[in-house]
Amino acid sequence: MAAQIHRLRDKAGETEKITINLGYVDLGHIDLLVQEGFYSNRTDFIRTAIRNQLLTHGEEVRKSIVRHTLELGLRHYTSADLEAVKAAGEKLHIKVLGLASIAPDVTPALALATIESITVLGALHASKEIKSALADRIG
């Protein structure tokens, strides 16, 4: 099965919303920097801070990706991909850093027959039925 790996770009449509809890003083510092024009808004500050930390730890992240044999970027699994895995009598251990997606035409039965485990550092896009069927295999 040929790998379909695509590098993710940071576009508005390719983001995942997160919620964080900050102390009042930290939030006040962020608001002050926004007010002074250092950042356009709180989100700009937080994204910049996260990118800076990722750059700081970039080498460690790269080594960890290699050590864990993670696919980097976008990995999409179609019904045809999983049918090929099933025909070969194999099972997948999916490991993705980025976005893993399972096509809408994949049935829960096909997913159960072909996916042994899923580890996603990022986001998993799949139907509610697929996520429910694979719940004990998602880690």
Residue ranges and their predicted role:
Residues 1-25, 34, 43:
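Short Lys/Arg-rich basic patches
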Residues 3, 8-10, 28-29, 40-64:
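Short, basic amphipathic alpha-helical segments that act as recognition/interaction helices
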Residues 37:
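C-terminal His-loop and adjacent cap/lid subdomain of alpha/beta-hydrolase
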Residues 55-88:
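Short, positively charged interaction helices/loops
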Residues 65, 80-93, 104-117, 132-138:
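Short, T/G/N/S-enriched strand-turn elements that build extracellular solenoid repeat scaffolds
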Residues 69, 74, 93, 99, ...:
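Detector for repetitive beta-architecture
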Residues 124-125, 138-139:
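Charged, polyampholytic interaction/assembly segments that form long, compositionally biased interfaces
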